[in-house]
Amino acid sequence: FMPKNLVIVESPAKAKTIEKFLGKDFKVLSSYGHIRDLKKKEFSIDVEKNFEPDYEIPEDKKALVKTLKAEAKDADTVWLASDEDREGEAIAWHLYEVLKLEPEHTKRIVFHEITKTAILKAIEQPRNIDINLVNAQQARRILDRIVGFELSPVLWKKVKPALSAGRVQSVAVRLIVEREREIHAFQSEASYKVTAVFLVPDTDGKLVEMKAELAHRLKTKAEAQKLLESCQSAIFTIEDITTRPVKKSPAAPFTTSTLQQEAARKLGFTVAQTMMVAQRLYESGRITYMRTDSVNLSELAINGSKEAIANMMGDKYVHPRHFSTKTKGAQEAHEAIRPTYMENAQIEGSAQEKKLYDLIWKRTIASQMADAELEKTTATISISNTSEAFSATGEVVKFDGFLRVYRESYDDDVEQEDETHLLPPLKKGQKLEYQNITATERFTQHPPRYTEASLVRKLEELGIGRPSTYAPTISTVQQREYVEKGDKTGEERSYNVITLKKDKITDATRTEITGAEKAKLLPTDTGTVVTDFLTQYFPSIMDYNFTASVEKQFDEIAEGDTKWTTIMKTFYKTFHPSVESTLAAKNAHKTGERILGDDPVSGKPVSVKIGRFGPVVQIGSAEDEEKPRFSPLKKGQSIETITLEEAMELFKLPRTLGEHEGKTVTVNAGRFGPYIYYSGTYTSLPKGVDPMEIELEEALELIKEKAEAEAKKHLKKFDEEPELEIMNGRYGPYIAYKGSNYKIPKDIVPEDLNLDACMEIIKLQSEKAASASAKPKRGKYTKKKA
């Protein structure tokens, strides 16, 4: 019996879920992502022939394609059920082309959730492949290939070898570089915040503390001093009390970018992690499609939420809402990210899946709940001998509404009001006793560095990238080492506190740690130099508006309003000549080079620049008779800010620590960090050990530890077969033989093996591998290309 229908999706997990909903007439197979792409090592685009792409089937997909071809041949109908965005449409088109499918036997189906209802409905309403969506994806892929392929050699020649440039990535790095420069240029300004604590009788006559604050900051210490002196003899009176109702409305359901931001703030997930977990939830039928910029909910979801809220919390919490999408070209998927079944408040799954699902469920439910109703009371307190006034605010929740389920988190650059409490009962004209009044020196903060989440928000705000590109962009800039995620240690600073208590004024200086930041995106020196170089020679590539306008053009292609080749021609006409002229230009200085001054000993110039393996300090120049001396920068140092003194410190290496068994022990710095050299062996210094401070004893201890670890790796050798060795690796014991590794079965003690037993294991595993490669291999699931 042959199933009449073949359904092809892009991932095995998705195939497994869909298979449950379709009868025995359907067979569901996976393409494991793209089955065809531009050639890896070649340009693969024929510019003369209207930018015709030259696609190839990667080696690891050939067996899979063969299987799919055979299965498609035997089926009456082939259903292409890849995801419903441009990327999915392109996968469907490549399958159609490569498998040589016939139009009358091929149907394209789309759905944005994997539920029985959605799948059966999709099968009732098939459509043709939308070539406009395919062209939009193809245009992005080809434009990105042109930029990457033509710009990278320019960087190899002008900055350093092995660099690569990407269209959206380069702009993302520019944002991070510019933010770092804003921070370095930032001048902090001081002002004084004045707060008072008053003692007020509560309903039972007991005195309670009530906090109040001066409505504005005072500019100088003298002004603060003067105000506190006035308060010494002042009478404090409640001049006015206002009470007004305040409503808070819930946030819209999640889009890709808001989910990435909230998961980072609430769960500490990286953007890539969020997408990986969300993909698993989508493919197992728990949530709708996770690449979307729409906040729309289906009627079904709104009704499902309504029932769930009424059952759990009662009718007064229900408030159905329709949200509309602001993003231009929100075409990727036509619904927000929400649970497939609103009645499921919890799911089975891994800890991460449960956490992310819980977040999505709460956000969706909250979006369909009533406003929170609060009452805000503000009391104005006059000071008898000055025109200044204090203000005390209190808030009371009359009805919690959606807050019962969900509160939105904020980034550290959004000012948050302190938690406010209920005010004690107050009357107009009431006189107040103060307990203390404090003027504290505060400072303006530099703009915060980006987190992954706030960078996504910025990219979306600027219209750069799309739901499918945020995560890959953020991963790529870190993989290429243009940006690193790191913590900034704070610095100590002192500040003034002037206090009035019991009519006495005291003046104190205190210290605090300021500016500490965790898991922020910091530009590397390479990232900074590449950004400056590209901004100078390729201003349009680095321009935010230009990058956003390219995204809009992709949207126009997807709508069928523009031909994709027209956009390619326009872009290439200006881009290609600037590549040619930049390559030909002669530069007097190396890109990013900074002269720090002269070496006090030799009088030669000292400069910093990007060397082959990263940032270096150089003494002397290539024209000198003597070869220049080089030293890599230490972690935390930057070519933008390093001083001559700090640079000279680096040349104190190599340091001789002493002798051991007649051989010298030295410490030095290399491209991978500081190391100890002794008797032909190199031992890396662990993090936190300073090469300028390490002593001989500690160095010998590290050498010994390394030797012991090495010895543990080598379990057994045989004289009669010197190429064979039993080793201990990170995944357990194995046999190393002629450049290949063979796993030792768990039930065998590796030290007990003799040579014959080893050869038997090798023979068995080689035969097994040979028979496995003869079968059609399951292709790897390659991640979607941005």
What role is predicted for each listed range?
Residues 3-6, 17, 26, 152, ...:
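Basic, low-complexity terminal or inter-domain segments flanking catalytic cores
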Residues 238-242, 249-263, 288-292, 446-458, ...:
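Short acidic, hydrophobic short linear motifs in intrinsically disordered regions
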Residues 54-57, 82-84, 101-107, 127-134, ...:
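Short, polar/flexible loop-turn hinges at active-site or ligand-entry regions and domain interfaces
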Residues 236-261, 330-343, 433-437:
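Residues forming anionic-ligand binding surfaces in small-molecule and nucleic-acid pockets
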Residues 2-142, 150-151, 215, 225, ...:
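Intrinsically disordered, low-complexity regulatory segments
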Residues 260-262, 266-273:
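A conserved hydrophobic secondary-structure block that centers on an alpha-helix together
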Residues 114-198, 243-247:
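C-terminal or mid-to-C-terminal helical accessory/interaction module adjacent to the motor/catalytic core
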